[in-house]
Structures are given as C-alpha cells and as structure tokens.
Amino acid sequence: MAAPSDNVDLFVARFNLEKEIKRIWVRHVGREPIPSDHATLVKQLLDLYLWGYLSKDVMGVIKEIVAICSYGIHDKSVTKFQLDFVKNNTRDVLSYLAAIW
C-alpha cells in the first residue's frame, strides 16, 4: 500500500522542519539539559522564540505548516489551499532556519 504523494510531501516537509528546529535547539542548549527526544516540538519552538531566534510571525507560519502536515500525515482532509500554503512556505522557512547558526 502506497501513501498518496501529497501525504508523502507533507511528511517530508514536517520531517525537514523538525530536523532544523531540533538542530538549532540542541546547538543553543549545548549540552542538553533534557534529552531532545523528550523536548516536544512545541517546547523547542517556544524556546527558540523566547531565545530570540524566531519572530512571532515566523513561529506562526511554522505552527501552521506543522498543523497542516499533521492532518495530512494522519489521513485527514487537507485542502488545495493548505497544500499550496505548505509548498509555498516550507522552502522559505527552511532557508530561514538554515541561516541560524
């Protein structure tokens, strides 16, 4: 059984975002006070915002992308507008995150 290509694209987008967010978070805390596997994505995003790495606007876009990706990954309905939002914003957000550290 193969997953629909849109669902695969959403998974890849979320995977890449989480990887970059975790990279920045781990690098900031250096020696992790808690294992990063136990720091949820929401905690990592909040920390990056509080540490000044993310603006409120960028954090909002990331949260929206992650929410849309979660719907698709769990086989819930995702509109064409939502798919386009993820496709049109993920690359820019990843470039933004890659430039941090």
Describe every region a protein language model picked out.
Residues M1-L54, G60-A67, K80-W101:
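Amphipathic alpha-helical interface elements
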Residues C69-G72:
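Short C-terminal capping segment of an alpha-helix within the protein kinase catalytic domain
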